[in-house]
From Swiss-Prot:
GO terms for cellular component: cytoplasm. Under oxidizing conditions two disulfide bonds are formed involving the reactive cysteines. Under reducing conditions zinc is bound to the reactive cysteines and the protein is inactive. CDD domains: Hsp33 (cd00498). Keywords: Chaperone, Cytoplasm, Disulfide bond, Redox-active center, Zinc. The gene is hslO. Redox regulated molecular chaperone. Protects both thermally unfolding and oxidatively damaged proteins from irreversible aggregation. Plays an important role in the bacterial defense system toward oxidative stress. Disulfide bonds join 247-249, 280-283. This is 33 kDa chaperonin. The keyword Translocase does not apply.
Length: 301
């Protein structure tokens, strides 16, 4: 199934639910950046979380940036997600791999906190005009889900549950995605409802398996996870929104960035290398500028 995002309400409209499937976007990010299993999972989770946060923005041009700055071997992470369903991202050390840890039940997991180390999660909301607004929280578990929930609680004072997950079989990514459940502003004082949501979330185990079961029918994920909350799909034009890995870079933008180096440095590049190669961090696309193009750019100063 193609990547998509769906919205619903629950508990008579008092709880907002959003789910996103990012399997194909994850595969595209992995291909472009030559990601390891560990970094594929971490970037996938961050892209999914970014799309969930962006889905609540009021303007269609709104975008959310998730950035991890820390002292661990991951060497940082950066995701840019839009209300329009586009997402892109990269990690500082794409080849990083850590040994899997085996539980007493025979399951395996990565130590995400070992990958991130100590540091901060920055979330920036940009509505396309005025100054973007950034909030910062300390990294907790490093697995993205709990860190985003911490951000929502401490920076936006929103009681939320965030689930992220993926399924890997025979070295292939079968599915990836995330879900968020939030108490709506009209019910934030309803302690009974808050406790009910908390209890329902505690019952959820193996989110990734639920995601796998719903990957061909994403709306069914809500009823699988919250049968007691009577979830109802929101029927609007942009529900069941298409999601894709899409970068906003272009050759023109790359040329504009090159001009920022200044005339003298561009002359030095032309004399020494006869060309310039620009690589987009977000999508790894390479833009080559030849000697004649460099001369033209220099002539514009």
């Amino acid at each position: 199934m193609a990547d998509s995002l769906v919205r619903a309400t629950a508990a008579n409209g008092s709880i907002a639910l959003v789910a996103v499937l990012t399997t194909e976007s994850t595969k595209e990010a992995r291909r472009r950046h030559s990601l390891s299993y560990l970094t594929t999972i971490m970037l996938s989770r961050a892209m999914s979380a970014g799309l969930l946060l962006a889905s609540s923005m009021k303007v269609k041009q709104g975008r959310v940036t998730i950035k991890i700055q820390s002292d661990g071997p991951l060497q940082g992470l950066n995701v840019d997600a839009g209300r329009d369903g586009t997402v892109r991202g990269y990690v500082g050390n794409p080849s990083l791999e850590l040994d899997l840890i085996k539980t007493s039940q025979g399951n395996h997991y990565f130590d995400f906190k070992k990958a991130t180390g100590k540091g901060y999660l920055h979330v920036t909301r940009d509505i396309g005009k005025g100054e973007p607004f950034t909030s910062t929280v300390e990294i907790e578990g490093g697995g993205i889900g709990e860190d985003i929930a911490s951000y929502l609680l401490h920076s936006e004072q929103v009681q939320s549950a965030v689930f992220v997950g993926e399924i890997i079989e025979d070295q292939e990514f079968i599915c990836s995605g995330a879900l968020i459940a939030q108490i709506l502003p009209s019910a934030v004082e309803n302690k009974t409802l808050i406790n009910l949501l908390d209890e329902e979330c505690k019952k959820i185990t193996g989110f990734s398996q639920h995601l796998l079961a719903s990957k061909d029918n994403l709306p069914s994920l809500f009823s699988h996870l919250f049968p007691n909350l009577n979830p109802k799909i929101i029927k609007t034009m942009d529900n069941n929104q298409s999601i894709s890995f899409k970068c906003r870079c272009s050759r023109d933008r790359s040329i504009s960035a090159l001009k920022l180096l200044g005339k003298e440095e561009l002359i030095e590049i032309m004399n020494e290398d006869k060309k310039s190669e620009l690589t987009c961090n977000f999508c790894n696309e390479i833009y080559n500028v030849n000697e004649q193009e460099l001369k033209t750019i220099i002539g514009e100063f």
